[in-house]
Design a protein with these regions (language model features):
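Donor nucleotide-sugar binding loop of glycosyltransferases
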Residues: 12-15, 43, 72, 98
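A conserved acidic beta->alpha catalytic loop
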Residues: 40-49, 95
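Hydrophobic helical membrane-anchoring modules
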Residues: 1-3, 144, 149-152, 175-249
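Acceptor/aglycone-binding surface of glycosyltransferases and processive sugar-polymer synthases
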Residues: 66-82, 87, 99-181, 207-217, ...
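Conserved donor nucleotide-binding strand/loop of the catalytic core
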Residues: 34-37, 48-82
Length: 249
């Protein structure tokens, strides 16, 4: 079994080193045949150069660069469509969920599901540091909107810790349209329409103050994205087959 870890990164030069060090340490400890794909989303700092430095020293690290700043959803799609592993997992650059939680998702996939998504709310006691109350409130409201408009009944669609069988990723991500924060419910909606099996798995998680999600601006965009998902479904955008194609730089 081979593994691909996708890490979307935007202006992460201050914290990408400890993240890569921990991922290298843990994957070696587990003796995994694994690659780490860091997708630089047009960073204005030296994120890309730091990753190149690591890639020169560690053959399992690869750098992908987006054509400018396109958003987290674009970065995840780009990484997934370049991934070579049998199981592909994307994780946030701050490792809000420790990489040591990955075996929980891998075990769910080995048990027969196509996609395993980390959840902060199936067992809330696993949150070692919670979000501010206003962000928790927004999350609950957004979750209700997803239930009403998209029929997604997961307790947590937004945790940035999700694993896919490669075959499932190659079916879902070519159809993804949303490039920024609202992509998570879109890929889950597409997966459900395809009849793919999705498991929600409780994971350790800690809030990071360095998050780049703007609660009002990006929150409003995410609600608009839900309407876009409904429109895309209505117009058949998620029905036509699409050939896997990734953006390279």
């Amino acid at each position: 079994m081979t593994y691909s870890f996708i890490v979307p990164a935007y202006n992460e030069s201050s914290r990408i080193r400890p993240t890569l060090n921990e991922m290298l340490r843990y994957t070696a400890e587990q003796n995994w045949d694994a690659e780490i794909l860091v997708v630089d989303d047009g960073s204005r700092d030296d994120t890309a150069e730091v990753i190149r430095e690591y890639a020169r020293a560690h053959s399992q690290i690869r750098l992908l660069q987006n054509p400018g700043n396109r958003g987290k959803g674009f970065s995840v799609r780009n990484g997934m469509l370049h991934a070579r592993g049998d199981i592909c997992l994307f994780t946030d650059a701050d490792l809000s969920s420790p990489i040591s939680e990955a075996p929980k998702l891998f075990e769910a996939i080995r048990s027969g599901v196509d996609i395993a998504i980390g959840s902060r709310w199936l067992r809330a006691e696993l949150q070692t540091e919670r979000q501010p109350l206003y962000r928790q409130a927004f999350g609950r409201i957004f979750n209700l909107v997803l239930r009403l408009f998209l029929g997604l009944t997961f307790k947590d669609t937004q945790c940035g810790f999700k694993a896919f069988r490669r075959a499932a990723a190659q079916r879902v991500f070519p159809l993804q349209k949303i490039e920024r924060w609202g992509f998570d419910p879109e890929i889950l909606y597409i997966a459900r329409r395809m009849g793919l099996k999705v498991a929600e798995v409780p994971v350790l998680w800690a809030h990071s103050e360095g998050t780049r999600l703007h609660p009002f601006r990006d929150g409003m965009r995410m609600f608009v994205d839900v309407l876009h998902i409904r429109w895309n479904a209505f117009t058949g955008a998620y029905s036509a087959p699409a050939a896997p194609a990734a953006d390279r730089m």
